[in-house]
Regions:
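Residues forming the flavin
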Residues: 1-79, 84-87, 95-425
Length: 425
């Protein structure tokens, strides 16, 4: 089989790359072992929450932070991608998911300060419309409403932690936690957020929860609910509940697996298929065929079944250490498909600093592929290993998504740009 663009990896970066290439009229394939960690992450899109990373105060403006970062760190993925591609990529992303019924709000000019299920405050630039009312800078108090039998969401615990949090320059409103008098049908082992989200698409459940909220909420309060307001969208369910409760409602992402991440993945998957992109999940990718500085084909296999896939351009979006796009053993760190050079500490003893909560982060979090301004992986002489192979997402070296709170922005921007560049070949 022959394609114009072959994207390896079906996470956020891979799907963005595929959509970007397809927009340029390219026959595109996405092939992956699995769905990527997008299905377990919070669903918020972090652009830049902290810079420098040692700062304890979150950035007010991601744009200003990115501009400064690009000027000071030319090896950071944002410097390779550029601010223009970040802006275009985020607009492209918002349009893609909106077409599938999932609305994302936000901008590069202002971070939200969103509460988390464990009671911390997280800076993030873009989030689902169903989370918009949760910014802790708003003065109105918050009722955290939970469900008896729902796993991993504890309103009293969240309320206590967030009410005692300290965020520089911010006065956090009062949070109180309550369990709603609603039978969700959980058995003795409890119910997952995904299961409850499916139930929340039923009219009877929406009516029951709406009435329970109306009885609990006080004048002037907002309501925080676990992110269980439907699998497909979330927008319609939360609007109906707002009407019934008579106040603003927002979702709070639960611990993994997260409904908001799953919802986002399904929206992107629908958009990918609508764009005519072929999506193959469950395949190993191996045995690349290379000649004269270019990748000509790869083999993909499921069990004993193997296929040869030719392509004019290839985008590698297999993730970092968590996604196994970079793997390690006791002696080395490798990129497993193409054998690309990996940038990072050569010794395991250098992966971590002595302080577990080191404000500067740990070197292992910056491991990945070094790329040029065209997002092509380079060798130790800074020359592209293959002229038609691009990389994006968590696989890139030189940034610490955990400390910077930059993972979503880097992934979307680099995926968008990699797909565009691949589509130009």
């Amino acid at each position: 089989m022959k394609y114009d663009t072959v994207v390896i990896g079906a996470g956020l970066g891979g799907l963005m790359a595929a959509l970007s290439a397809a927009e340029r009229g390219k026959k595109t394939l996405v092939v992956s072992k699995g769905m990527g960690i997008i299905t377990i992450f919070s669903g918020t899109i972090d652009i830049l929450g902290y810079y420098p990373v040692q700062d304890s105060a979150p950035l007010s403006s991601p744009r200003e932070g990115v501009e400064r970062l690009i000027a000071e760190d030319p090896n950071h993925p944002y410097a390779r991608v550029g601010l223009e591609a970040l802006e275009e990529g985020m607009s492209f992303f918002q349009d893609a998911v909106a077409r599938e019924g999932v609305t994302y709000v936000g901008s590069l000019d202002r971070n939200f300060l969103a509460p988390t299920a464990v009671g911390t405050v997280k800076p993030t630039a873009f989030l689902s419309k169903s989370m918009e009312a949760g910014d802790v800078r708003e003065e109105s108090d918050v009722l955290i409403a939970g469900f008896r039998g729902l796993k991993d969401f504890y309103p009293a615990y969240m309320a206590h932690n967030i009410s005692t949090s300290r965020v520089s320059g911010i006065s956090i409103p009062h949070f109180r936690g309550r369990i709603l008098d609603v039978d969700i049908g959980a058995d003795h082992s409890g119910m997952s957020a995904l299961t409850l989200a499916r139930k929340m698409e039923e009219d009877d459940m929406i009516q029951t929860v709406g009435r329970a909220l109306f009885r609990q909420v006080r004048d002037g309060e907002r309501v925080a609910l676990p992110a269980v307001l439907g699998i497909r969208s979330g927008d319609d369910v939360f609007r109906r509940l707002e009407d019934m409760a008579g106040t603003r409602i927002f979702e709070t992402p639960t611990l993994p697996p997260s409904v908001t991440g799953y919802r986002l993945y399904r929206a992107l998957e629908r958009r990918v298929r609508a764009a005519g992109i072929r999506l193959l999940i469950g395949y190993d990718v191996h045995d690349p065929e290379v000649a004269r500085g270019r990748v000509g084909a790869v083999s993909i296999s499921m069990g004993k079944k193997t296929k040869r896939i030719e392509g004019d351009a290839f985008v590698l979006a297999t993730g970092g250490l968590v996604g196994r796009g970079v793997i390690t053993d006791r002696k080395s760190t490798q990129e497993p498909i193409f054998g690309l050079p990996v940038t990072g500490p050569s010794k395991r003893s250098e992966w971590f600093t002595e302080r577990f909560f080191d404000p500067a982060g740990h070197p292992i979090n910056r491991i990945g592929l070094t790329v040029d301004d065209q997002l092509r992986p380079v060798d130790d002489t800074d020359k592209p290993v293959y002229k038609n192979l691009f990389a994006c997402g968590a696989q890139l070296a030189g940034y610490d998504a955990l400390r910077e709170k930059s993972g979503g922005g880097v992934t979307i921007a680099s995926g968008f740009k990699a797909g565009r560049l691949a589509g130009e070949l």
